[in-house]
Curated annotation (Swiss-Prot):
GO terms for molecular function: cyclin-dependent protein serine/threonine kinase inhibitor activity; NF-kappaB binding. This is Ankyrin repeat domain-containing protein 42. One of its GO terms (cellular component) is nucleus. InterPro entries: Ank_Repeat/CDKN_Inhibitor, Ankyrin_rpt, Ankyrin_rpt-contain_sf, EF_Hand_1_Ca_BS. ANK repeats lie at residues 25-60, 64-93, 97-126, 130-159, 163-192, 200-232, 235-265, 269-298, 302-332. Residues 7-19 have a biased composition (Polar residues). The gene is ANKRD42. The keyword Repeat applies. Residues 1-21 are annotated as: Disordered. PANTHER family: ANK_REP_REGION DOMAIN-CONTAINING PROTEIN (PTHR24201). Transmembrane segments: none annotated. It comes from the Eukaryota. It holds the Pfam family Ank_2. It comes from Homo sapiens (Human). Keywords: ANK repeat, Repeat.
Length: 389
């Protein structure tokens, strides 16, 4: 139990020569029970639950100030975390650096453990002694899954630490490109990334240069952020892309239906409105674009289709929608039904001047459509008569 000097398993718990005659392992503290690890071990040797049932002190701390919850968060022991929460463990307890179990789960990339703690109602924006929040730790250590989860749970990515660093500064400093891209996409404006300086007067470009993070530098230079107000420029040149990016379906409909933009219009980087909507996970915009016949197989300059962009930003519903559409397109191209008139409408030659609607006209419509042709023949006969006389 807590407070026992020798916290390791007792010598009497060692296995004998006969593998069938094993003795139970007795742990000196709840910390050793959590260190034991996976769920099978926990159930087989009756450790954590046994200690909890017998009144083990879940507030006991190590020399670093770690409680059992801290160790479970570090090791990603989901079952341990659940058991500790059910027994009233304090998830706001701070260690010597001011870190809570939430900070440590984000540091070590245990997103499922992190989600269990978030569901218990713990504050996701708690700070340590350096004013780092869990999002700062996730960005600094390149834990994209944890970072996305924390943002989904409402954590702000515009909170600064004691040095004025945003999470995007920390991602740039450590060269975590995927986290950097995700944070850039979630900032309130594209230019805010370069305009944000920490207390040392450094922005993301300065930090990437100082720590020789070439991948971050190449991304910034390739995207041409420096010295340009991309938001204003894009709003003027590609209003449809901006509407799709913001999820403004009403504006997008108006622009397309009024003929202001083409539904597959491509921006300077080769992206279409569907790319923009997919990158932000705007399902309603995507559904409307698909209904209007937007091409989901167009790639941008990075070689990404809309489904690839949705994958990059972890919008799973958008990925599913677009991949099902692409699967349908592939099957549709392989199966030709000569008796299906609508097949030829869907697969009409691009730029053809033929009226594809004529294929589905009723008999009355076809009769009406031939009337102008009769008038033309009558006028030709009259012209011939005039020329002869």
């Amino acid at each position: 139990m807590p407070g026992v000097a020798n916290s390791g398993p007792s010598t009497s718990s060692r296995e004998t020569a006969n593998p069938c005659s094993r003795k139970k392992v007795h742990f000196g503290s709840i910390h050793d029970a959590v260190r034991a690890g996976d769920v099978k071990q926990l159930s087989e040797i009756v450790c954590l639950h046994w200690l909890l049932w017998h009144g083990a002190d879940i507030t006991h701390v190590t020399t670093r100030g770690w409680t059992a919850s801290h160790i479970a968060a570090i090791r990603g022991q989901d079952a341990c975390v659940q058991a500790l929460i059910m027994n009233g463990a304090n998830l706001t307890a701070q260690d010597d650096r001011g870190c809570t179990p939430l900070h440590l789960a984000a540091t070590h990339g245990h997103s499922f453990t992190l989600q269990i703690m978030l569901r218990s109602g713990v504050d996701p924006s708690v700070t340590d002694k350096r004013e780092w929040r869990p999002v700062h730790y996730a960005a600094f250590h390149g834990r994209l899954g944890c970072l996305q989860l924390l943002v989904k749970w409402g954590c702000s990515i515009e909170d600064v630490d004691y040095n004025g660093n945003l999470p995007v500064h920390l991602a740039a400093m450590e060269g975590h490109l995927h986290c950097f891209k995700f944070l850039v996409s979630r900032m309130s404006s594209a230019t805010q990334v370069l305009k944000a300086f920490n207390d040392n007067g450094e922005n993301v470009l300065d930090l990437a240069q100082r720590f020789f993070k070439q991948n971050i530098l190449q991304f910034i230079q390739g995207a041409e952020y420096e010295g340009k107000d991309l938001e204003d420029q894009e709003t003027l040149a590609f209003p449809g892309h901006v509407a799709a990016f913001k999820g403004d379906l009403g504006m997008l409909k108006k622009l397309v239906e009024d003929g202001v933009i083409n539904i597959n219009e491509r921006a300077d980087n080769g992206s279409t409105p569907m790319h923009k909507a997919a990158g932000q996970g705007h399902i309603e915009c995507l559904q409307w674009l698909i209904k209007m016949g937007a091409d989901s197989n167009i790639t941008n300059k990075a070689g990404e289709r809309p489904s690839d962009v949705a994958k990059r930003f972890a919008h799973l519903a958008a990925v599913k929608l677009l991949e099902e559409l692409q699967k349908y397109d592939i099957d549709d191209e392989n199966e030709i039904d000569e008796n299906d008139v609508k097949y030829f409408i869907r697969h009409g030659v691009e730029g053809s001047t033929d009226a594809k609607d004529d294929l589905c006209l009723s008999d009355l419509d076809k009769t009406d459509a031939r009337r102008p042709s009769k008038n033309c023949r009558a006028s030709w006969s009259m012209n011939d008569y005039v020329e002869k006389n």
